[in-house]
C-alpha cells in the first residue's frame, strides 16, 4: 500500500495552464482593408466583469496585426439589447463592423468569444460578410472542474480550501470561459463551512470561507460560478458529536455495520439542513450552488439504506408513514430552502448516482417525479445503457464516452421530469475507458449526446468527474453545443468547430474525427474492461514467465500498487 502523500503539483501541464493561450491563425493572411480597429464598449458594466473578455479579444486582434485606435478602422461594438434568456446574444456582422448585443454581461462574453472564433477562422482577419448570428443556451448550467485540484478523498484527502495553492490561474479561467464553462465545482462538507444551532463551528471554517470567497470573486471575472460538491447530509458513526448530542436527527432503526443515516421526517433534521445551508450561502452569496449526491454514492438519508434495485420498505418507515420518495423530497426541499435563504439565485443539483446496470427499483424510477420543482434532478446519462457487441447485448453501468446514449432509464427520468429542471452527468473529455490522455477526439459523440439532451429538455450538465476535465477539443465542442438549436447539420457544426484551429484543413480533420468516432464506439462495453484493462496501466502489469495470479488493481486509487496478471477478470463479462 502506498503512503498517504500530498499530490505533487510540479507537472508540466500545470505550468502550461498558467499561460494564456497563444493566438494561432491556421490560414494567416495579410490584413484586410482595416489595419486599425477600435472597441466601443457601450454595454453597461459597472463591476467590470467583461474586462477579462475584452482583454482576450484585444490579445487575439493585436496578434492578427491590427492596431487599436480610438476611432479609426474596424469597429467592434457591444451594446445592451433585450434577449429571450440569460446568456443569449446577437452578432450583427457587416463590412467594417461587428455589433455584439445582449441583455446581460454573460451574453456579451459569449458573443466576444464567438467573434474571436470567427476572427481565427478567417485567418486572423476581421470577417467581412453580412450576417446576423443569434445564439441562446439550452443548457443554462455547464459545470467543469480543475484537472489538478484535490479530490479530497481517502487516502490523500487534501482540502484545497486549506492550502495556499491557486488552482484557478487566470489563463485557465479564460480557457474555461472561452469553452463555455460557467461553473466549476470543488469538494467540501456542510459542517466544514456552516454552523447551526445543532453544531459547533469547525476550527478551520473561517479559513475555508475566506479562500472560498476569494476563489468565487476571481472566477466571477470570467463569468464562472463556484459550486460546492457534497454528499450530504453525510451519515455519521456512533461516536460523532452530532449523533451523540442530537439522536433525534437520525433514523431510529440501527443497521449493523452501517453509519447512522439522517431522518428527513424529523423536524429537527429539516431545521438543521436549512440553518447550515443558509449560513454557508449567507457567508459566500456569490456561490452558484451545491451539487449533492443525495443517493447512491455514500449513505446520507434513510433511503440510502436500500440498494437501487431493492423495493423493500425502510426499516423504520412505518413510523413516519411517508413513502421513500416523500422522505427524499423533504430533505431536498430543506436544503434548497436554506440555500435560497442565503442567496436567492443559488441552486441545488440533486444527483442521484445509480451507476449499476441492474434494473431500478420503483422508488428510484420515481426520483425525477418527486424532486422539488426548484431543484435540478441530475442522473447519469449513460448508466444502464445497452449495446450489441460480439453478437450479444451488453449492459454497462457508470460513465462512458464511447456510448452515445442516453440509457433508457435516463430517457424515462427526463420524460417524467415535467415539474422542474433536469440535469445530466456526462463524461466527455475522457472516461475510465482511457484515462491517461487529456481527451478523446470524438466531438461527433458529443454532438449526439447534446442533441439528445436538447430533445429531452435538459437544462444542466456536469461534464466530468475527477477525470476527463482537461481543456481541449471536447470541452470546446461541449461549450458550443450548449448553444445549439440543432437546426443545422452535424457536418456544419463539426466544420465550424474545426475552422478556428485548422483552417483550410478542417474538412480533412472532420473526416479524421469521424473515423475516431466509429472506432471508439467499438470499445468493449464492459465495466470490468473499462476499469481494469491494460489501456490505463499496461506498463505496470506483471509479465512473468510463470503467472503469479495476482488480482488486477484499480488504477484510479492511489493506495493500490499497479500490476496484477489475472487478465481473465477483464473479459469475463464481455465475451
Where does each model-flagged region fall?
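Short acidic low-complexity segments
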Residues: 63-75
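Short, Φ-rich (hydrophobic/aromatic) sequence segments
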Residues: 56-61, 112-119, 471-484
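Short phosphate-binding/catalytic loops that engage adenosine nucleotides
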Residues: 66, 181, 224, 344, ...
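Short, solvent-exposed secondary-structure boundary motifs
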Residues: 58-60, 74-85
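Zn2+-dependent metallopeptidase catalytic core
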Residues: 50-66
Amino acid at each position: 500500500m502506498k503512503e498517504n502523500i500530498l499530490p505533487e503539483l510540479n507537472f508540466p501541464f500545470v505550468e502550461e495552464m498558467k499561460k494564456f493561450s497563444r493566438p494561432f491563425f491556421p490560414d494567416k493572411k495579410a490584413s484586410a482593408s482595416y489595419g486599425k480597429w477600435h472597441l466601443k464598449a457601450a454595454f453597461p458594466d459597472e463591476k467590470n466583469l467583461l474586462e477579462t473578455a475584452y482583454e482576450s479579444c484585444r490579445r487575439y486582434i493585436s496578434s492578427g496585426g491590427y492596431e487599436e485606435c480610438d476611432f479609426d478602422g474596424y469597429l467592434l461594438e457591444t451594446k445592451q439589447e433585450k434577449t429571450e434568456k440569460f446568456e443569449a446574444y446577437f452578432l450583427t456582422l457587416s463590412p467594417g463592423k461587428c455589433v455584439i448585443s445582449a441583455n446581460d454581461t454573460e451574453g456579451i462574453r459569449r458573443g466576444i468569444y464567438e467573434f474571436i472564433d470567427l476572427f481565427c477562422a478567417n485567418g486572423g482577419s476581421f470577417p467581412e460578410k453580412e450576417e446576423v448570428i443569434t445564439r441562446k443556451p439550452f443548457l443554462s448550467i455547464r459545470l467543469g472542474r480543475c484537472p489538478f485540484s484535490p479530490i479530497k478523498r481517502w487516502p490523500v484527502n487534501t482540502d484545497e480550501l486549506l492550502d495556499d495553492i491557486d488552482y484557478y490561474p487566470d489563463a485557465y479561467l479564460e480557457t474555461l470561459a472561452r469553452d463555455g464553462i460557467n461553473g466549476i465545482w470543488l469538494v467540501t462538507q456542510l459542517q466544514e463551512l456552516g454552523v447551526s444551532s445543532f453544531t459547533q463551528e469547525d476550527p478551520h471554517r473561517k479559513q475555508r470561507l475566506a479562500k472560498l470567497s476569494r476563489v468565487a470573486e476571481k472566477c466571477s471575472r470570467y463569468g464562472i460560478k463556484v459550486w460546492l460538491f457534497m454528499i450530504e447530509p453525510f451519515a455519521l458513526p456512533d461516536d460523532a458529536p452530532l449523533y451523540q448530542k442530537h439522536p433525534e436527527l437520525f433514523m431510529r432503526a440501527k443497521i449493523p455495520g452501517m453509519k447512522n443515516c439522517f431522518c428527513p421526517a424529523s423536524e429537527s433534521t429539516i431545521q438543521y439542513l436549512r440553518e447550515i445551508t443558509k449560513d454557508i450561502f449567507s457567508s459566500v452569496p456569490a456561490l452558484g450552488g451545491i451539487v449533492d449526491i443525495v443517493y447512491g454514492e455514500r449513505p446520507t438519508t434513510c433511503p440510502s439504506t436500500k440498494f437501487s434495485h431493492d423495493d423493500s420498505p425502510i426499516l423504520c418507515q412505518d413510523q413516519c408513514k411517508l413513502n421513500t420518495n416523500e422522505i427524499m423530497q423533504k430533505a431536498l426541499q430543506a436544503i434548497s430552502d436554506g440555500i435560497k435563504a442565503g442567496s436567492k439565485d443559488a441552486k441545488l443539483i440533486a444527483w442521484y448516482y445509480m451507476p449499476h446496470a441492474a434494473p431500478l427499483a420503483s422508488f428510484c424510477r420515481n426520483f425525477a417525479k418527486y424532486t422539488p420543482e426548484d431543484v435540478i434532478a441530475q442522473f447519469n446519462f449513460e448508466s444502464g445503457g445497452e449495446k450489441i457487441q460480439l453478437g450479444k447485448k451488453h449492459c454497462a453501468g457508470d460513465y462512458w464516452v464511447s456510448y452515445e446514449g442516453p440509457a433508457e432509464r435516463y430517457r424515462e427520468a427526463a420524460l417524467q421530469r415535467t415539474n422542474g429542471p433536469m440535469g445530466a452527468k456526462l463524461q466527455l473529455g475522457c472516461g475510465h475507458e482511457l484515462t491517461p490522455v487529456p481527451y478523446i477526439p470524438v466531438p461527433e459523440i458529443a454532438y449526439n449526446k447534446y442533441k439528445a439532451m436538447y430533445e429531452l429538455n435538459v437544462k444542466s450538465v456536469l461534464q466530468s468527474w475527477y477525470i476527463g476535465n482537461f481543456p481541449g477539443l471536447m470541452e470546446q465542442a461541449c461549450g458550443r453545443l450548449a448553444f445549439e438549436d440543432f437546426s443545422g447539420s452535424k457536418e456544419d457544426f463539426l466544420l465550424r468547430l474545426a475552422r478556428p484551429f485548422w483552417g483550410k484543413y478542417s474538412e480533412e480533420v472532420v473526416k479524421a474525427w469521424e473515423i475516431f468516432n466509429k472506432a471508439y464506439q467499438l470499445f468493449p462495453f464492459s465495466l470490468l474492461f473499462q476499469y481494469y484493462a491494460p489501456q490505463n496501466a499496461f506498463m505496470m502489469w506483471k509479465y512473468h514467465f510463470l503467472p503469479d495470479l495476482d488480482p488486477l488493481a484499480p488504477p484510479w486509487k492511489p493506495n493500490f500498487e499497479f500490476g496484477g496478471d489475472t487478465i481473465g477478470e477483464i473479459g469475463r463479462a464481455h465475451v
